[in-house]
Amino acid sequence: MQNIDLISEEEAQKLLEELADKIAAYNHAYYIEDNPLVSDSEYDQLFNTNLKLEQKFPHLILENSPSKKVGAKIANKFAKVMHQVPMLSLSNAFDEQDVRDFVDRIKIFLRLNEFAPIFCEPKIDGLSFSAVYKHGVLTTGATRGDGYVGEDITANIKTIKNFPHKIDNVPEFLEVRGEIYIEKQDFLNLNKEQEEQGKDKFANPRNAAAGSLRQLDSSITAKRPLKYFVYSGGVTEQNLASSQDQLLTKLKECGFNINEISKLASSEEEIFAFYEYLKTNRENLPYEIDGVVYKLNDFALQNRMGFIARSPRFATAHKFPAIIGQTKLLSITVQVGRTGTLTPVAELEPIEIGGVTVSRATLHNFQEIARKDLRIKDYVFLQRAGDVIPKIMGVDFDKRPNDTETFDTPLFCLSCNSKLHYTPEDIIIRCDNGLNCPAQNYERIHHFVSKNAMDIEGLGRKQVEFLIDKGLISNPLDIFFLKEKNDSSLAKLENMDGWGKKSVENLFKNIEKSKNVSLPRFIYALGIRHIGEQNAKLLARAFGSYNNFIAQMELLRTNEPDIYQKLNNLEGIGDKILVDIIDFFDVKENIELIKKLGEILNIEDYKETREQSSLTDKIVVFTGSLPTISRAEAKATAEKLGAKVAVGVSSNTDLVVAGVDAGSKLKKAKELNIKIIDEEEWLTLIKNV
C-alpha cells in the first residue's frame, strides 16, 4: 500500500475508487455469502487506509465510501425487515493508544472532566440478530443485513434452544439485539457430521452459525447447535434501564441469555486489565471471540454522542492480535479471474490455527512473492484472525531447506495460453484474451448469475462449470434459452450426473424469475472491471433506464464528448474507471450481448429512495462557542438530520447557528441576510424536526 503522507490527490482518488469496490465485494462475501475472502486484519488494513485517505482528502469522499456503510445489501431469498434503529458496525481499536483516543474523544465531545464509566464485554465472533416482541410475544427475528434492512429469520430463530418466545413484564414493543454463535466443540462435531454425509465442511464457527441461521428450511436450523447472547436493545432499551449494566440485568430477568463475563470499568487501567484477562484466557472459552467491546455505560450520554455514518461514537471494538502459525509451502498455483487478473495462491501443508484447518492462503500479487522471497518448500508464518483465508506474513529463513524452488511468474495465461503483457514493475498481471479465455468466460458467467447480480439460485460454480463443459452454455444469454434447448434435446439435463427432475425444474423456475431485474443489478451483472455494486448504482442513477443506458454506452464508441463529460462528472467514477467502461463497451460483442439480453429481460428503471426532513440538504454553519453542547455534537446532530455542515458562510448558506463570541461569519451572514439563530433556538428546532 502506498505511503499516505506522500500520495498525490490524483493517486488518492484512484485508490479510494479501488478500495470502495474491493471493500464492497468483501462485505458482500462476508455478510451475505458467509464466505470471507480476506482475513480480518487485511480487511481492517484496507478500511483504515480508506479512512486515512478520506481524512487527508475530505473533498474526495465518495458517495459509495465504505466509511458510510455497514454490512451488505441483503439477498432476495428472505423477506426484508426494516430496522427501526439501524444496526451499525463498530469502529476498531488495535492498540492501547487507540483506546485512549476513544476515551479522550468521549471527554471532548461531552465536555467531561472525569472518566465516564465504560462497560466492557467479549466480542463474540458470530452473526448479529434483532428480535422484536409485541405484547411480550416474539413476532420478528432479523439479521443485520446492510444495517438498515435485514432478512426475516423469525422461524429459524425460534428453533434456538432457550430463546424466549414469550416474556412478561416488558413494554408493549421490545427489541433485543445480540449474537448467534456455535461453540468450538459443537463446530468440530458438526463438521464431522458434514464429512460423514459427504457434504462440504464449514470454514469456521461463524460461517457455520451464519449458514445454519440463514436456511430456508427451519427444520435444518433446528438440528444445528446454535446458541446466543443478547447485548443490547433497539428502540426500547431506555424504557427498561438507564445504563448498559442495568439493561443486561433486566434482560436476564426476562429469560434471555447474557454473557456473564463483563466489567464496568471506572478507569483506563481497568479497561486494559479486562482486555489482557480475555486475551490470555480466550482459548479456554467454549466460543470464539476476536476482541473486547467498550461502550459508554450511561444511555443518556450515549444518546448525546450519537452516530457517524456506519458506527456509534460511544462504542468501539478493541481487536485481539491475529493468531500466528507455521507450516510448509507446498506449491504456488495461479487463478484467472473474470477480468483476466492472475492471482497467485499458496498451497500449504494443512495446519490447524485457532480451531480451523488451513491449507491455502492468497498471495494477492506476484510482487509479494518476490518481496517476501517466498520459495516452494519454505516454512512460512501464517496469520489468522478468526476467518477462513489467512495471510502469509513471511518466511522462517532459519529453517529454509537446501532444495527450495523459486517461483517463476508466468509469461502465458494458464487457461488460454495467450501471452501476458506486463513489465516487472506491474502489480496486477492480466490476460487480455477476454472471453476467448475459458477461465475468464467461466468467471464472467458465474458472476452474472451470482446473488447480487442476476441471483439465479441453483447455478453455483459446479453447475456453471458443468453446463459449459457440456456445451449447453457459452455466454450469459445462453442461460435464458437453456430450457428451450433441453426440451428439444434427446440428452435431457435431468438425466445427467448430479441433476434430477426436481433440481432442473427449480433451476428453470429460478431462471424465469430472474428475468425481472433492477437496472443497478443488471449493470453489476455485466462484470465491467471496477464496476461493483455501488458504482453500478451510480451509473443506474445517472441514466435512469436500460434504454437510455445502452444508447449512451453506444455513443461511447463514437467518441461523443457529452457522454464522456457526463461519466467524468459522476462522483465515484474517476479516470481509471472511465477507461474500464470505455474498454468494455468498445468491444462490439459486449454491446450485442447486452442488446439481446435487453430484449428478453424486464429491466426495471432506477428508483431513488430517500428519507427527508426539514433540514435535509440545508447548508448550516456553526460559529462561536455554544453554551451547553460541543461543536462536534451540534455538527453530528445536524448531519444526522440530513443537513450539510459548512465551515464558511456564503450565499448558498441556509442557516447560521451563532454562539458566544461569533465573529466574521456572523457579520457576513447578516450582510447576506441569512437566517441566524442561537443555541436555544437550534435545540428547539431539532427537537421539532
Swiss-Prot record:
Origin species: Rickettsia peacockii (strain Rustic)
Protein name according to UniProt: DNA ligase
Cofactor(s) needed for function: Mg(2+); Mn(2+)
Keywords from the UniProt entry: DNA damage, DNA repair, DNA replication, Ligase, Magnesium, Manganese, Metal-binding, NAD, Zinc
Cellular component terms (Gene Ontology): cytosol
Residues at which Zn(2+) binds: C413, C416, C431, C437
Catalytic residue list: K123
Keyword S-adenosyl-L-methionine found: no
Gene that this sequence comes from: ligA
Keyword Ion transport: no
Residue ranges of every copy of the BRCT domain listed in the record: 610-689
SUPFAM superfamilies xref list: BRCT domain (SSF52113), DNA ligase/mRNA capping enzyme, catalytic domain (SSF56091), Nucleic acid-binding proteins (SSF50249), RuvA domain 2-like (SSF47781)
Family: Belongs to the NAD-dependent DNA ligase family. LigA subfamily.
Pfam family, one: HHH_2
Positions annotated to bind NAD(+): D40, S41, E42, Y43, D44, S89, L90, E121, R144, E179, K295, K319
